[in-house]
């Protein structure tokens, strides 16, 4: 469902006519070699497209106009090979709507000590050209990612590739919508939010459809489509064959087919459900939701559209990377002193992309929702480094709360727990991490990912100009409290 190859990134090289045709030709040749080399590296998720060297204000403005109008262009990378006076860039940068990365590099890795002359100095001027360019970004208060180092370095390429994945997620969010079936769970605060502001800042179009419309589609699903889907279930999962289980699984298959059809019609990238509004649905969607998340859709339970959008964004960022991403909830604690852990789960809806084993389809009673016993996938989660992230609406801005965690083995069986689960240790430790999370107002609903790291989420928040706070191994609680207070002042004063 998610294809990052559909996007491209425009590589913009700055110079000026002052240098003459011979120097400008060398600039173009060297830029072409850089871009060709980058495109040969499989680390990059999308194609990088070199545009003609930019030498005047009109050329710069025109290229940004074209980038804004091209839905394939997910972002722009700028590099000043020579000195490119930044007043020429003001009009173009002022209209730019695409995520921007400023690459501060140089064609040659080393100074040619024996042969360096003024021709070389005249050509290789990014050392001061990019400083000039950095000033105009700072002066205009523009969001951007800055990557410094030689373009052949692994670390440089890794940072560019991460940012590209983030930019793809931003473009994806601007092109699709989040479908809400029903409203938020009654009386819950943290799942609420300003949907208009979300579309302005995050690009997400969030709209509601009646559950009855989905229920009618479920009733109309042809039996042959159900049988085809059951074959797929048997291949991918450990599936029971008793009559009680099969009846429930068939109902989830119908819900999955109807949901997928509906989401495709609406060009949706994510969706929400709520157990308080199920109308004529036979079950609370469980297996169906897990399967659609596995395809790449974002999801939020109990109407949590912010969680749905964040899960989708991270799924785009992590496309084709090892690991997975899921809707998650901090459910219960293991509080042995010195080994405090969080058990993450939800009633039904945990994505199998984070499973460490072949998932089992199980059918169990669920009193919440008042419907028939729902089928769901049950498994233990993957182990290793992960992130837990939440978006909350602070009234005058969105805040992204991010916690680095370590997913650990589940060493004891839980034979009576009928839901997928993952066990993690928050960093730096349970008490400090949880204190910081609560101080920041982080939600009980999160996006949990073993596919990405914190840098992706920082890049995402900075590109979208929303607040973020990070809870990791370097946490100092007193400094964190100060950061929250300073942020309150900064975002209160900011008028953008």
Swiss-Prot record:
Protein's UniProt name: L-arabinose isomerase
Protein keywords: Arabinose catabolism, Carbohydrate metabolism, Isomerase, Manganese, Metal-binding
Note accompanying the cofactor annotation: Binds 1 Mn(2+) ion per subunit.
Highest taxon in the source lineage: Bacteria
Cross-referenced HAMAP family: Arabinose_Isome
NCBIfam families, per database record: PRK02929.1 (NF002795)
Organism: Thermotoga maritima (strain ATCC 43589 / DSM 3109 / JCM 10099 / NBRC 100826 / MSB8)
PANTHER family attached to this UniProt entry: L-ARABINOSE ISOMERASE (PTHR38464:SF1)
Annotated catalysed reactions: beta-L-arabinopyranose = L-ribulose
InterPro entries, per the entry: Ara_Isoase_C, AraA_central, AraA_N, AraA_N_sf, Fuc/Ara_isomerase_C, Fucose_isomerase_N/cen_sf, Lara_isomerase
Role played: Catalyzes the conversion of L-arabinose to L-ribulose.
